[in-house]
């Protein structure tokens, strides 16, 4: 799946979790919007979710995930596995082209349309067109800069935006203590 048009990163560092995303929305090779918000809070603000991919597909998955979070009373891993199972087996959901990063104070997970639920070893996850660049930058900053998670996530996205034409520097972020 070739996801272009956004970058989302989640950094878990020094007891804090920050998810950040750029604001660019691209239709083909045209920038349609600069300040979109692709990070959402759910479950009384205790869970963060960020999405990359087709906007309509991402909103559909976001709504489905939010319903699973409610069903499992905020248990992030159980909600993620339940969504991945539905995503993999439902004929309509299977066609959706989007990725999600979800996080609470204990867990960070990447959810894919292939039914994958991946928990990164180092607490850092990134998706979207500039995801690899942001991930590399965040890992380096985490190891060497001594910055808090919000600054690491923001700077990693800025670096990704300098490299990836589908990522801009209109960054929004949300943090959990």
UniProtKB/Swiss-Prot annotation:
Signal peptide: none annotated. It comes from Syntrophotalea carbinolica (strain DSM 2380 / NBRC 103641 / GraBd1). A double ring-shaped homohexamer of HslV is capped on each side by a ring-shaped HslU homohexamer. The assembly of the HslU/HslV complex is dependent on binding of ATP. Belongs to the peptidase T1B family. HslV subfamily. It is found in: Cytoplasm. Keywords: Allosteric enzyme, Cytoplasm, Hydrolase, Metal-binding, Protease, Sodium, Stress response, Threonine protease. This is ATP-dependent protease subunit HslV. NCBIfam families: ATP_dep_HslV, PRK05456.1. GO terms for biological process: proteolysis involved in protein catabolic process. It catalyses: ATP-dependent cleavage of peptide bonds with broad specificity. GO terms for molecular function: metal ion binding; threonine-type endopeptidase activity. Na(+) binds at residues 161, 164, 167. Pfam families: Proteasome. Transmembrane segments: none annotated. Protease subunit of a proteasome-like degradation complex believed to be a general protein degrading machinery. The active site is at 6. InterPro entries: ATP-dep_Prtase_HsIV_su, Ntn_hydrolases_N, Proteasome_sua/b, Proteasome_suB-type. One of its GO terms (cellular component) is proteasome core complex. It is an enzyme of class 3 (hydrolase). HAMAP family: HslV. Its EC number is 3.4.25.2. Allosterically activated by HslU binding. SUPFAM superfamilies: N-terminal nucleophile aminohydrolases (Ntn hydrolases).
């Amino acid at each position: 799946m070739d996801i272009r048009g956004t970058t989302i990163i989640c950094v878990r560092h020094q007891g804090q979790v920050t998810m950040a995303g750029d604001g660019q929305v691209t239709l083909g090779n045209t920038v349609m919007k600069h300040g979109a918000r692709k990070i959402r809070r759910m479950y009384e603000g205790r869970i963060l979710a960020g999405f990359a991919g087709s906007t309509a597909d991402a909103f559909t998955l976001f709504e489905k995930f939010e319903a699973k979070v409610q069903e499992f009373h905020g248990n992030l891993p159980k909600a993620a596995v339940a969504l991945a199972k539905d995503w993999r087996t439902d004929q309509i959901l299977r066609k959706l082209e989007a990725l999600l990063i979800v996080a609470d104070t204990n867990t960070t997970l990447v959810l894919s349309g292939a039914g994958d639920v991946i928990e990164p070893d180092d607490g850092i996850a990134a998706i979207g067109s500039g995801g690899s660049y942001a991930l590399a930058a965040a890992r380096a900053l985490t190891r060497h800069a001594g910055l808090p998670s919000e600054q690491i996530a923001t700077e990693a996205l800025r670096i990704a935006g300098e490299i990836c034409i589908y990522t801009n520097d209109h960054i929004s972020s949300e943090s959990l203590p």
